[in-house]
Amino acid sequence: VSRGLGDVYKRQVLSDNIGIIRLVLGACFTNCYIVYNIRTNNCLIIDPADDAEKIIDNISKNGLKPQYILVTHGHTDHILALGALKEKYNIPVVISRIDAPRLLDEELINERPYVEVPYKAVYPSVLLGEGDEIWLDDIRFETMILPGHTPGSAAFKIDFKNSTGHRTDENKDTAAQYMDAENTIYQVGDSNEPDNIKGIIFTGDTMLAGGHGKTSLPGGNEEDICLLYTSPSPRDTR
């Protein structure tokens, strides 16, 4: 029985070829994103937090075809549906090289009090480093390694100009409309000028509304995460 907000559902078109479904899942109310290519219906799943049946149901009812599972970091509340989705779709599991061992640590994952179905180790298929890319057809996801919440926390950036589907006058402001206080998606560019929104970043728990994820959990480092917020950012992130 889910103790989270598995019925929270939001679907949005961000560009001519990029759509996103957000689900809030599990006891920790974790954001899970299904990013899909509007032209092909191919999709990937970011942070399969919990409630695998809810994720599978949303994929099915929207006619989507999963290609990858991306994990921003290896904390329990972001991966409890990982095994079920891997078994269902037999698709690559993608995580940073640094955080990959966490997916194998059943004891650490299962010690959290909200785990109802014991987690079983999942071996990742793709190990990422800074700047590595994952492509969903013509949509490019660039990896950003952002230590602090965990040593290998990753964010995934979509640069609109490097995807072939450019925004039109009809939907150019939907990215700005989509950003809200409950998301862990952040835009690149000026949120007050929709034409200047250059892309979006899926941040996991590295960046939250009004702050950042805990650094008191295993692998957290306050100094590392403070550097992310105090160092000049060439990425024009808002």
Label every PLM stretch briefly.
Residues 24, 36, 129, 135, ...:
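Residue-level detector of conserved, well-ordered beta-strand and adjacent loop positions
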Residues 10-62, 155-164, 195-203:
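Conserved beta-strand hairpin/beta-sheet module of binuclear metal-dependent hydrolase folds
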Residues 1-9, 232-238:
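Single conserved hydrophobic/aromatic residue that forms the stacking wall/gate
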Residues 109-111, 139-238:
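Metallo-beta-lactamase
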Residues 44-46, 68-71, 143-145:
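Short catalytic-loop micro-motif centered on adjacent basic/acidic residues
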Residues 51-135, 139:
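Active-site HxH/HxHxD metal-binding segment of metal-dependent hydrolases
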Residues 23-25, 117-118, 123-125, 145-149:
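Short Gly/Pro-enriched turn/cap motifs at secondary-structure boundaries
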Residues 33, 126, 131-132, 154-156:
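Residue-level detector of beta-strand structural context in well-folded domains
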